[in-house]
Each structure stands twice: as C-alpha cells, then as structure tokens.
Swiss-Prot record:
Source species: Methylobacterium nodulans (strain LMG 21967 / CNCM I-2342 / ORS 2060)
Record carries keyword Transmembrane helix: no
UniProt record, GO biological process: adenine salvage; AMP salvage; purine ribonucleoside salvage
Keywords: Cytoplasm, Glycosyltransferase, Purine salvage, Transferase
Any one GO molecular-function label of the UniProt entry: AMP binding
Record-given protein name: Adenine phosphoribosyltransferase
Assembly: Homodimer.
CDD domains: PRTases_typeI
Entry GO CC: cytoplasm
HAMAP family on file: Aden_phosphoribosyltr (MF_00004)
Function field: Catalyzes a salvage reaction resulting in the formation of AMP, that is energically less costly than de novo synthesis.
Major location category of this protein: cytoplasm
C-alpha cells in the first residue's frame, strides 16, 4: 500500500491520551470505521495479501475484530468465526485463559468452528503485547485450524506482540504503527 494511503489511515485513527488510565494513549478506530473511504481502504489492505489464495475462515476477536474480520471474510468469500469472551457462545466450546496486564481473562470458540486443516486468518484492530492474539492462535490451533496469518490495523511495536506471534510461526500483517502504549 502506498505511503500516502497508510498515512491517511493513520490520520483516521483518533488518539485519546490518558485513557483508560494515565500514561496510556488509546487508539480509537471508531473514527476510521465511521469514514467510509478509510474503512474500505483498511479492509482492502487487510485482504490484499490473501486475495486469490485459499482462506477457508476468518476469525475475529471480540469486539472490533468482529467488525473488521466480518468485512475481510466477505471480501475473501470466506466464513467468519467469532472468538468471544467466556460464556457468550451458545454451543459446545473450547476455552483458554490468558494473562492481562492486571489479572487473567478467558476467551472461547465453538469446538466445531473450523474443520481440521482449515486455513484461517486471524483479524483484530490492534496488537499490543500479543497476549490476546496468542491465546486466539492457540485456540484456533487446538480445534485444528492452520493459522495462515494474523492481521491488525494497528501495531504498537514497542510492546512486542507482533514479534511474539512471529515466534509462533504466524506471519503478521499490520497497516500502521504507533509509538508507545
């Protein structure tokens, strides 16, 4: 993607200082989602590396990963798999606990969400430390998926999440980087 388009995408993301706590700059993609041109360019850029290839499913992490992942799945003519917080899926699930900055959380996926060997792309809005994304990759692999790549609109490279996924042999595709937290 050309640098001007990437710059425009970055400009479409609102930065909110000291949210949710002092010292954190929250990267708010709702402004990008609300701009039809920016939203389309972001989805097109997330789809680009996989166009023409076989992607069976796109998995999105709750909640913004649902918005982006659904759009990516549509463009790739793939199915969509939601990865949700524990207790939100109605059928038989597989769950995983993962570490947060303060404490732990759990996410889950339907146990039959993919067929063994399905080629899956994981999508979310942002990668920071990589804890949530790593848990999602682990869940997908646990139910038999081949995780082809993980895609994010935003990377916070100082926090090392993308590197953590690459160490698991998961290629990472991001659109824009922001410094800091």
């Amino acid at each position: 993607m050309d640098p001007r388009t990437l710059s425009a995408l970055k400009d479409a993301i609102r930065s909110i200082p000291d949210y949710p706590k002092p010292g954190i700059v929250f990267r708010d993609i709702t402004t990008l989602l609300g701009d039809p041109g920016a939203f389309r360019r972001a989805v097109d850029a997330l789809v680009h590396p996989f166009a023409g290839g076989r992607i069976d499913q796109v998995a999105g992490i709750e909640a913004r990963g649902f918005i982006l992942g659904g759009a990516v799945a549509h463009q790739l003519s793939s199915g969509f798999v939601p990865i949700r917080k524990k207790g939100k899926l109605p059928h038989t699930t597989v769950s995983i606990a993962y570490a947060l900055e303060y404490g732990t959380d759990e996410m889950e996926i339907h146990s039959d969400a993919v067929k063994p060997g399905d080629r899956v792309v994981l999508v979310d809005d942002l990668i920071a430390t990589g804890g949530t994304a790593k848990a999602a990759v682990d869940l997908l692999r646990q139910i038999g998926a081949e995780v082809v790549a993980a895609c994010f609109v935003i990377d916070l490279p100082e926090l090392g999440g993308a590197a953590k996924l690459r160490a698991l042999d998961v290629p990472v595709w991001t659109l824009v980087e922001f410094e800091g937290h």
